[in-house]
């Protein structure tokens, strides 16, 4: 952090370099749970780089900060602008977060479930994975049947995989794949299940079976092309 601050304070340094350092320093402040310092730096970059990729990136970070803090209205105001960003990746990220907020503040108008979920996502950003998993378990207990349930299970499975709990990740994903009411994340869960079997558990036959399920059950899924490629490779087609 000291080195980044020195770059920012140096005279005659290229403005782009300074602002990139500010964004990185803002991220580090957020990792240290100092959001006010982070948003100050992001806002400076937003102001100096209006209508540019770096400025959009800073605005997206400010939107996430507002989301983490449970201020969904402010987050949405940032995201509405970013959805029109010229950078496709930023526009897509903004759209995803915007939809998450919209979808989960309709029935739960106070956004209590989403606030709990956002707090967990901040823990994930800070790499506090055991605390994040515990937070997800608490969310499932406090808000049974909440529209966020599938998102919660899916994120929990991802974190279990990252911490090496492959059996736990498989069991969690099966909560989604075995639920006939689950729809939006069903193909995501099935594809991740197949990857865990292939890459972590090393059960190639099971992975092949699951990739085939992705192809057959979800022909319109974004994962079909990759699932077909992996299925053929596991089958020994030499693709």
Descriptions of predicted regions:
Residues 1-239:
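Acidic, polar-rich low-complexity tracts and alpha-helical solenoid repeat scaffolds
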């Amino acid at each position: 952090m000291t080195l980044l601050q020195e770059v920012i304070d140096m005279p005659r340094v290229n403005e782009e370099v300074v602002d990139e350092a500010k964004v990185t320093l803002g991220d580090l402040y957020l990792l240290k749970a100092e959001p006010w310092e982070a948003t100050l730096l992001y806002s400076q970059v937003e102001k100096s780089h209006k209508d540019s990729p770096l400025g959009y990136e800073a605005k997206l970070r400010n939107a996430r900060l507002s989301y983490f803090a449970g201020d969904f209205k402010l987050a949405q105001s940032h995201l509405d602008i970013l959805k029109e960003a010229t950078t496709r990746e930023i526009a897509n990220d903004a759209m995803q977060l915007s939809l998450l907020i919209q979808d989960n503040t309709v029935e739960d108008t106070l956004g209590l479930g989403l606030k709990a979920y956002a707090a967990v996502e901040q823990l994930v950003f800070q790499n506090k994975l055991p605390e994040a998993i515990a937070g997800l378990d608490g969310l499932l207990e406090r808000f049974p049947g909440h529209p966020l349930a599938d998102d919660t299970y899916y994120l929990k499975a991802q974190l279990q995989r990252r911490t090496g709990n492959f059996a736990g990740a498989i069991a969690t994903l099966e909560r989604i794949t075995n639920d006939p009411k689950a729809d939006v994340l069903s193909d995501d869960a099935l594809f991740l299940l197949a990857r865990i079997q292939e890459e972590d558990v090393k059960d190639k036959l099971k992975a092949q079976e699951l990739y085939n399920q992705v192809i057959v059950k979800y022909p319109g899924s974004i994962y079909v092309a990759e699932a077909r490629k992996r299925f053929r490779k596991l089958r020994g087609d030499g693709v």
